[in-house]
C-alpha cells in the first residue's frame, strides 16, 4: 500500500535499466531517500502500467535513482512518476491474520481486499535502549529437545539450519501453534526469495493443521508476507521489513508476544547485493554489498524484546557451499542467540523433531539464566549422547557384547534419551495419528533426570519413542508389557 500526499510532486522518468529507474523532479522538490514513487497510467503503447519504486540515491541535477518493487516492463522515458511523500506502508493489526501479502502490503491470495485504514511505514528506527527488556527470559516452546538443550530467548533470534526434507517447516508450524495456544501470541511469516511452490505448500499445510482458518481469517494465528524467487531484487530486499513491520504492531500496540519467521535470511542479503550492484556501488568481499553489516543490522536490531512485548525470531539460514566463513552467514551469526541444527541422520531414523542435540547451541544455556538443575541435566544428556557417538565405531566392528558394563549402560540410556527427545506434534496429528503433546520445561527436566539416574533402566527403549512426558513413557511401557 502506498499513500499519496495531497500536494502531488510529479517528476519524469529519464532512464530505465532493468529494475532501476532514474527520474527528474522539479527544483527544490526532490523526494527523500526511501520515499515510495508511483508510476501509474498508460504507456505510449496503450498498456496499463502500475509500478512502485523506492528512492535509493540522489544523483544531483534534480535526479533520483530508485529501485522497482515489481517488473519494469512497459516503462518508457518521459512517463510521469509521482512522489508519494512517504515510505512504502503496509496494513497492520488483526486484518493481516490469515492473509498473504506482497512487499507493498497488497493481498495476493484472491480473498478480497484488506482494510487499509491502519498502515505503518516499513522503515522505522529500532526501539530505544531504555525501552528494551534486558533481563534474559527463556521462551518455553513445549518442544522437549529445544527447551532442554537449546532454550530460546524471549525476543531473541534463532538460526534454523537444515537441508530439504528434514522438518524445518513442521517445527515452524508447531512453534506457531504453541505460541498461539500457550502464550496468546501471533506469528508473522516472511518468505524472502524462496520458491513460490514452497510458499503455496506452506499456506495449504497451515490450513490443514488449523493454523489458518480460511472461513474466518481473523481467527488465524499467522500473517504471511511473500517476496519469492521470481520477484525483482527490490521486492526480495524489502519483504523482510514488510513482515517485521506487521510483527512490530502486534508487539508495540497489542502488547503481544510475536514469533517472526524469516525464510530465508540469506536471500535478503543476496537481494541487497543485487541492488547494490545495480546502483553501481563498489562490491566488497566475495562480491557482497559494501553496506552488508548495516543492512543486516538494520533488520536484526528491530527484532527484540521491549518492556511491552517481544518479537522472537526464527530465521532459516542457507549456508552457501556449506562455507560458514562466507560473509553473509558470518554476518548473520553475529546477531543470533542460538542455533537449531536439523540432522538428516536423525530424520532417517524416524526421530522427529530431528534437532541435533550435539550441534545445536544457545547462549541461554548458562546456570545463571536457566538454573543449576536445568544446566546440569542438559550437559549430562549431551555428554551421554557424545559418549554413545564415540562408541558407535566399536559397536559397528565388534558388537555390543565387547563393551564394558558401564559403556553398555551408557549406550542403553543414550538410546532411550535419543528416543525421548522425539515428540508427537499437534500440527502433525493428521499425518502420524498420534495426538500432539506440549511438555512443560519442569516435566522435561524431570523425565531426563530419571533416565540419567537409572530409574528407568528396566523400561524398553521403544516406550520412550514419540511420547510427551515421562509418565506417558511409563504408561506406554506397561501397555507394551501386556502386549
From Swiss-Prot:
Pfam families: ATP-synt_ab, ATP-synt_ab_N, ATP-synt_VA_C. It catalyses: ATP + H2O + 4 H(+)(in) = ADP + phosphate + 5 H(+)(out). It is found in: Cellular thylakoid membrane. Transmembrane segments: none annotated. PROSITE patterns: ATPASE_ALPHA_BETA. Its EC number is 7.1.2.2. Keywords: ATP synthesis, ATP-binding, CF(1), Hydrogen ion transport, Ion transport, Membrane, Nucleotide-binding, Thylakoid, Translocase, Transport. The keyword Iron does not apply. It is a peripheral membrane protein. One of its GO terms (molecular function) is ATP binding. ATP binds at residues 162-169. Belongs to the ATPase alpha/beta chains family. Produces ATP from ADP in the presence of a proton gradient across the membrane. The catalytic sites are hosted primarily by the beta subunits. This is ATP synthase subunit beta. It comes from Rippkaea orientalis (strain PCC 8801 / RF-1) (Cyanothece sp. (strain PCC 8801)).
